[in-house]
């Protein structure tokens, strides 16, 4: 896992249950960084996909 900091807040689409929301400044653990959508885990254990351009690897 690689940590990434959120540059912006993101609200997951209600139409896509695989997306997760996060707030600016949150630190997510990146599980898979291939492609434009990364698989990430929040500190509460929630796992899902996030837009990579909203994050910066730490």
Predicted regions mapped to residue ranges:
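Src homology 3 (SH3)-mediated interaction modules
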Residues: 1-58
């Amino acid at each position: 896992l690689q940590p990434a900091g959120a540059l912006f807040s993101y609200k997951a689409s209600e139409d896509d249950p695989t997306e997760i929301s996060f707030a600016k400044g949150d630190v997510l653990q990146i599980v898979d960084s291939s492609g434009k959508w990364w698989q990430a885990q929040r500190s509460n254990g929630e796992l899902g996909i996030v837009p990579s351009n909203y994050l910066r690897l730490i």
